[in-house]
């Protein structure tokens, strides 16, 4: 087996390569529109046109009004704004209880923890073993003082897609605002805010081939979480700070392109994902898929290899030119087991050997086959040197022999 000459990038859930068309537009905005979009003269108007066009493109992609799109510095800021802004707004009505899931992105988890330190109460809904949040569990947790339900649309580690429409209906039945972190969903699957019925939705440009450091929060008309950043009158006085003109232009263009070709992109990524899952589960003993397959992002494969540490596999893959992940890139410096996998009941020792492979439109079947070739060589070789694996095999053999006597 020979190494591929190019890098095989299979970590598209962490970030995606910037689309050339988006980059070209960003360079044009940086080099040509030198004015402040709030200024009332020609070069300011040129900059504002980039902002207005980007806002319209983002709004169209999720079936919203441009006036409902508020640009942020990233998806994490959008999440913080939705959660903390709602909490501070509703606290004035003596509503200080929030509901989320136990396997959210850390932008939500840490925002909730921050609010708990301020005296708010948070209920964490446990997902099923396949990685889904049940609407009936959300409804059972709602109280008279509940301010917000925040459930992610698609999990960033295992890719499971949640029944957001049904959860939003439950929340609204009780007069509770509904937010969804759709950072992994927007640009990857169809997202229609009117169909979903959510009040707020977070997104991030670099997840759909746009620039890093650029996000947005959709707020349904009439929904105003308290500002987190005060200052100027930008973003309809809801998020101060001079707009990132080039970032907004690139975000709008990238999302427009992603949604224009969404069906074929989804089919392509699903083909690669299913090939890898089927082959690995068939050819590598005890490999297991984490999360259900039926409602799952088309490009996500999260697989555990018992008896090994994910970091070891990661290094081997890197030596073969393959970029993958042991979980969320936002928590990649930690050796603790994934809170996502623990929440769905994956044992800690198995969770440590989990790998996330996420495909994008630029990936090929040749790359998917190469990944499997490498894993089929690396996993048995590493297991042969793994005390954890050998001990487990000897224990299993011991009990098997006892059963034969």
Give the residues covered by each predicted segment.
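Pyridoxal 5′-phosphate
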Residues: 1-405
């Amino acid at each position: 087996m020979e190494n591929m000459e190019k890098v095989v990038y299979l970590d598209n859930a962490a970030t995606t390569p910037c689309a050339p068309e988006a980059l070209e537009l960003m360079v044009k905005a940086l080099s040509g529109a030198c004015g402040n979009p709030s200024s009332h003269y020609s070069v300011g108007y040129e900059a504002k046109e980039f902002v207005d066009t980007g806002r319209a493109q983002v709004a169209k992609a999720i079936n919203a009004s441009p006036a409902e799109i508020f640009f942020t510095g990233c998806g994490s800021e959008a999440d913080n704004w939705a959660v903390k802004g709602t909490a501070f707004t509703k606290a004035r009505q003596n509503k200080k209880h929030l509901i989320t899931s136990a396997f959210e992105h850390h932008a939500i988890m840490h925002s909730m923890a921050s609010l708990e330190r301020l005296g708010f109460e948070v209920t964490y809904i446990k997902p099923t073993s396949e990685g889904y949040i049940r609407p009936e569990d959300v409804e059972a947790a709602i109280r008279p003082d509940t301010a917000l339900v925040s459930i992610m649309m698609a999990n960033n580690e295992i890719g499971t897609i949640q029944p957001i429409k049904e959860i939003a209906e439950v929340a609204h039945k009780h007069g509770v605002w509904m937010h969804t972190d759709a950072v992994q969903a927007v640009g990857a699957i169809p997202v229609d805010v009117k169909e979903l019925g959510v009040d707020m939705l977070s997104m991030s440009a670099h997840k759909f081939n746009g620039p890093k450091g650029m996000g947005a929060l959709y707020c349904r008309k009439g929904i105003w979480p308290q500002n987190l950043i005060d200052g100027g009158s930008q973003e309809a006085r809801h998020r101060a700070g001079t707009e990132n003109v080039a970032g907004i232009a690139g975000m709008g263009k990238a999302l427009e392109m992603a949604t224009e070709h969404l069906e074929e992109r989804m089919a392509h990524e699903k083909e690669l994902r299913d090939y890898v899952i089927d082959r690995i589960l068939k050819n590598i003993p005890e490999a297991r898929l984490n999360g259900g397959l039926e409602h799952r992002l088309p490009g996500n494969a999260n697989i555990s290899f018992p008896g090994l540490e994910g970091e070891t596999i990661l290094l081997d893959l890197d030596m073969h030119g393959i970029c993958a992940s042991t979980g969320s890139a936002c928590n990649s410096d930690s050796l603790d087991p994934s809170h996502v996998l623990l929440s769905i009941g994956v044992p800690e020792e198995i969770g440590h050997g989990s790998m996330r492979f996420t495909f994008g439109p630029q990936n090929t079947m040749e790359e998917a086959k190469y990944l499997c070739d490498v894993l089929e060589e690396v996993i048995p070789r590493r297991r042969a040197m793994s005390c954890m694996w050998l001990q487990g095999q000897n224990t299993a053999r011991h009990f098997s022999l006892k059963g034969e006597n």
